[in-house]
Design a protein with these regions (language model features):
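Short, charge-rich amphipathic alpha-helical segments embedded
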Residues: 1-7
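Catalytic cores of enzymes
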Residues: 12-69, 75-398
Length: 398
């Protein structure tokens, strides 16, 4: 929070009352999980606030965690995925970081959308009647943090939530205010930085030598053609070169190995390093590095840190996104879980094509989701639901 405050020149002593609410868009939703209740505050037109409460006859956090896990399993998120392993969390932790469902006496859900329907009924239906804007911003709490909001299913309309709304997520209301009102020091820029498949063959983590990521390279090359930008690939994607460009671009896309929990991205070791064996500071892009950079980026896309092991890494996603937001980025696009490499490529091509056509990040995201949902090969929820836009909605002049 201190980083965010310094970047956006907001005093830590500032009070967030009516003045704060006046700066936030309508249909901003704050959710809080109590012992047996879920509390909702929805910002309306004219600074009005709608308050509501959903009472549950059980421990709210445990039940919501159970529902979330059921949803993941029912749509196939927990199944192995055919994709490049860009995550080093399991190596760092010396164990698999796959999340296990909490114990519950609840009987298994019966149909594919059962948990998605129940999640909708618990956290959207109580406030659906006051969500009158197409764009909604959700500030979740506890077990609701980065639930699969786009795939929540309304049994009445037979629609997924993303079909009715363009959804963004914010780590906190104060964070959202800082991001949506950047300082006067912000300078417009139209350039893009695309980083893919850094040369990491000299790097060992936990005794394991990192391997190349050809799909990551293919990804940024294809995006580069859409944006008419030459990407940094292989040996050119050094930490020194990336750091020198970070603060001068409007768009950052990184497809590389990463450690989500530590907030680290692995780049090509600087060639002029003093020792043959690269040290961490030669190749690791860390949260501390980002804290020292004044980013001008309107959008950061992180296509890294995922594996095919059926993991959902909500806390890590928030952490690394906060680092980029704290360094000055306006918004960050991340994925909660890994998807098939071909599906990821299809998604990215659609997303960037809509961006260059002038659509906002949230609209381009929805269009890309819809593109996959209507496709023959990637129509299942596990392919289009993981992508989350954290922070502001932005337009890019590319």
């Amino acid at each position: 929070m201190e980083i965010l405050q310094s970047r956006y020149r907001i005093s830590a002593k500032q009070e967030f009352g009516d003045e704060m609410l006046s700066t936030l868009p309508p249909s901003t939703v704050f959710m809080a999980v109590g012992r047996k209740e879920i509390y909702f505050w929805v910002l309306l037109q004219g600074n009005a606030v709608h308050f509501d409460k959903k009472y549950l006859e059980k421990d709210a956090a445990e039940y919501l965690n159970w529902l979330k896990e059921q949803a993941y399993h029912q749509i196939g998120v927990r199944s192995p995925v055919e994709c490049e392993d860009r995550s080093l969390d399991a190596i760092r932790d010396k164990k698999s970081s796959t999340v296990q469902p909490p114990e519950s006496s609840q009987s298994p859900c019966e149909d594919k959308y059962a948990a998605l329907r129940k999640l909708y009924d618990q956290i959207i239906r109580p406030i659906a009647h006051v969500l009158r804007e197409r764009n909604i911003i959700i500030v979740p709490d506890g077990p609701l943090c980065l639930a699969p909001f786009p795939a929540l299913f309304d049994s009445d309309s037979e629609k997924f939530l993303f079909e009715s709304y363009r959804i963004r997520v914010a780590p906190s209301l104060s964070c959202l205010k800082m991001i949506t009102h950047p300082s006067a020091a912000y300078k417009g820029t139209k350039d893009a930085l695309l980083v893919g498949n850094p040369a990491v063959e000299d790097i060992k983590v936990g005794g394991i030598t990192l391997v190349p990521l050809p799909c990551a390279e293919e990804e940024v090359e294809a995006i580069g053609k859409i944006l008419k930008t030459k990407p940094l690939i292989g040996k050119s994607a050094t930490k020194e070169e990336v750091l020198s460009r970070l603060n001068a671009v409007a768009l950052i896309h990184i497809a590389a190995h990463g450690c989500m929990e530590a907030g680290e991205i692995f780049l090509t070791p600087n060639p002029d390093r003093p020792f043959k064996e690269p040290e961490k500071e030669d190749y690791l892009l860390t949260m501390a590095d980002l804290a020292g950079v004044q980013l001008q980026a309107r959008l950061v896309v992180l296509s890294c840190c995922h594996s095919g092991r059926g993991e959902v890494k909500a806390e890590g996603v928030v952490g690394i996104a906060r680092s980029f937001l704290g360094a000055g980025a306006r918004s960050v696009l991340v994925s909660l879980w890994a998807i098939n490499d071909k599906a990821a490529m299809e998604f990215m091509m659609s997303f960037y094509q809509h961006l260059v056509e002038g659509k906002s990040a949230s609209e381009a995201l929805n269009k890309a989701r819809e593109h996959l949902r209507l496709s023959k090969d990637f129509c299942e929820e596990k392919h289009w639901a993981p992508f989350v836009l954290i922070g502001d909605d932005v337009h890019l002049e590319l």
